[in-house]
Curated annotation (Swiss-Prot):
Keyword RNA-binding: yes
Quaternary context: Part of the 30S ribosomal subunit. Forms a tight complex with proteins S10 and S14.
Cellular component, GO, one term: cytosolic small ribosomal subunit
Gene3D superfamilies: 3.30.300.20, Ribosomal protein S3, C-terminal domain
Gene Ontology biological process terms in this record: translation
UniProt-recorded name of the protein: Small ribosomal subunit protein uS3
Region (Disordered): 214-264
Comp. bias (Basic and acidic residues): 219-240
GO molecular-function term, one example from the UniProt record: mRNA binding
Pfam families, per the entry: KH_2, Ribosomal_S3_C
Amino acid sequence: MGQKIHPTGFRLAVTRNWSSRWYADDKDFGGMLAEDIRVREYLKKKLKSASVGRVVIERPAKNARITVYSARPGVVIGKRGEDIESLKADLQRLMGVPVHVNIEEIRKPETDAQLIADSISQQLEKRIMFRRAMKRAMQNAMRLGAQGIKIMSSGRLNGIEIARTEWYREGRVPLHTLKANIDYGTSEAHTTYGVIGIKVWVYKGDMLANGELPVETAAPREEERRPRRAPRGDRPDGARNGRPGGGRGRAPRKADAAPAPEGE
């Protein structure tokens, strides 16, 4: 069932962490969870042009700490920090507690699954061919270090009357392997023909249980490798297999005697 289950939920507490990190009593849990959902929807709408990959919400001691991972942190901060101050005020009004906002930059947006899905959905809304958008995203991800990528689009692709699903994959995407670092993202493209769903899986290598990358063993140096045997042509003739005449084990044929002259 590795093909069906959510890749992030499958790896929680193994190699991935939760995006909401707080504890609450049973009576408060539902309200705080709904609050988190409203905050995420607000940030998705407010920072639509800032290329936001993910949002982490923490609640330490009647406060809230929100970390926004963005490929364009300058758009979030704004000139002289004006935009982030207004964003902080809106979040405090939504959550009812003091809010501290951190901005983290995404170094390689071409390998972030959520940003890839959002980019493809924006291109589909601009009437770009879905195959071209998918293949271009795959090429960029593989060029910048991804070990594998899979993209799936579902809906009325190119405006056809019957909805279908198409997917492309390049490299390895081991969905059953728990230690595999699989980044997963989804998005929706609202076109004139209807909604098209995009799913993206990006394989970035294996991880240890603590979330760190495994230490790769160095390859043996050239001088430490076992010396190769000399080519067959460099060995002396007649001593190839310990037998005379090469490796066939037959002695060379003797020359035939010359015929006697006639009349003798």
